[in-house]
UniProtKB/Swiss-Prot annotation:
Enzyme class, spelled out: hydrolase
UniProt cross-references to Gene3D superfamilies, sorted A to Z: Nucleic acid-binding proteins, P-loop containing nucleotide triphosphate hydrolases, Probable gtpase engc, domain 3
Species the sequence originates in: Listeria innocua serovar 6a (strain ATCC BAA-680 / CLIP 11262)
UniProt keyword annotations, A-Z: Cytoplasm, GTP-binding, Hydrolase, Metal-binding, Nucleotide-binding, Ribosome biogenesis, RNA-binding, rRNA-binding, Zinc
Function description: One of several proteins that assist in the late maturation steps of the functional core of the 30S ribosomal subunit. Helps release RbfA from mature subunits. May play a role in the assembly of ribosomal proteins into the subunit. Circularly permuted GTPase that catalyzes slow GTP hydrolysis, GTPase activity is stimulated by the 30S ribosomal subunit.
Protein name: Small ribosomal subunit biogenesis GTPase RsgA 2
Binding-site list for GTP: 112-115, 164-172
Cofactor(s) the protein needs: Zn(2+)
Length: 291
């Protein structure tokens, strides 16, 4: 019996990487009865039938798992946003960050297409970059060679997911990190301002000593399992100040003597970050319950 990691799931087969080899495996027949559904990224125990095929016997415990994309055991999330085409959006960036923070996955922000931006756009993005770095996020510009090497170092020995709108340059970034990938890239559709989807399934691809999951592009994020009272924990600069609020259950909205609102007024917390927090908070409060 061997242990390995699922790097691709396609047409009922699971492709398991173990000791430098890839095995095409099927899941045991009793998995469905046991309500076990293997995911890309899962660590598994499997039995080899021949040099290339085998059966998955068990799925080992998961550190975490995303629903969309369906990937397990993620160490870091590389969030790619373009400077232009489509334009950089702090609203979208913060929503992606919340989606990743709530899963306790370390996010890394990458900004692509900076070479296509005007001087004014570059100046504005530099301001946003400083805000996110002050919070504690690492921000890289994918056009810069030193930053590409830093991204490779981040991925080394880890499983990462790369996410962002379609058309922002995720596949281009992966191709630049590993020239053997030759992933398809897409231009932006002029009518919708969105990229054509070029990634059809989730697959872990080797980048140095690590793996990265390229995932279908998406521009909307759902908060099905996020509660209003836990949203503040997805904003690190707010979580750091919550102990200074007068009320223990302060949600930093209409409550008096709120340390977070005081920090916003003192420009210690970026106004746009607080604005997005309130927007998402209201969405969560107004969400219709699902039965």
């Amino acid at each position: 019996m061997l242990e390995g990691q699922i790097i691709k799931a396609l047409s009922g087969f699971y492709y398991v990487f173990s000791e430098g080899k890839i095995y095409q495996c099927r899941a045991r027949g009793n998995f469905r009865k046991r309500n076990i559904s293997p995911l890309v990224g899962d660590d598994v125990e499997f039995q080899v039938e021949n040099k290339t095929d085998g059966y998955i016997l068990d799925v080992l415990s998961r550190e975490n798992a995303l629903v969309r994309p369906p990937v397990a055991n993620i160490d870091i999330a590389i969030l790619v946003f373009s400077a232009v085409e489509p334009d950089f959006s702090t609203n979208l960036a913060d929503r992606f960050l919340v989606a990743i923070e709530k899963e306790d996955i370390q996010p890394v922000i990458c900004i692509s297409k900076m070479d296509l931006a005007t001087d004014a756009e570059k100046e504005q993005i530099a301001v946003y970059k400083e805000v996110y770095e002050t919070i504690g996020y690492d921000v890289f510009v994918t056009n810069d060679e030193p930053d590409k090497e830093a991204i490779k170092d981040y991925i080394s020995g880890k499983t990462a997911v790369i996410a962002g709108q379609s058309g922002v340059g995720k596949s281009t970034l992966l191709n630049s990190l590993n020239s053997d990938l030759t992933l398809k890239t897409a231009e932006i559709s002029n009518s919708l301002g969105r990229g054509k989807h070029t990634t059809r399934h989730v697959e872990l691809m080797p980048i140095g000593d690590g793996f990265v999951a390229d995932t279908p592009g998406f521009s909307s994020i759902e908060w099905d399992d996020l509660q209003p009272e836990t949203l503040q924990f997805c904003f690190p600069e707010m979580e750091d100040r919550r102990s200074g609020c007068k009320f223990r259950g302060c949600m930093h909205d209409n409550e008096p003597n709120c340390a977070v609102k005081t920090a916003v007024e003192a420009n210690e917390i970026a106004d746009f970050r607080y604005k997005h927090y309130i927007q998402i908070l209201q969405e969560l409060k107004n969400r219709k319950p699902r039965y």
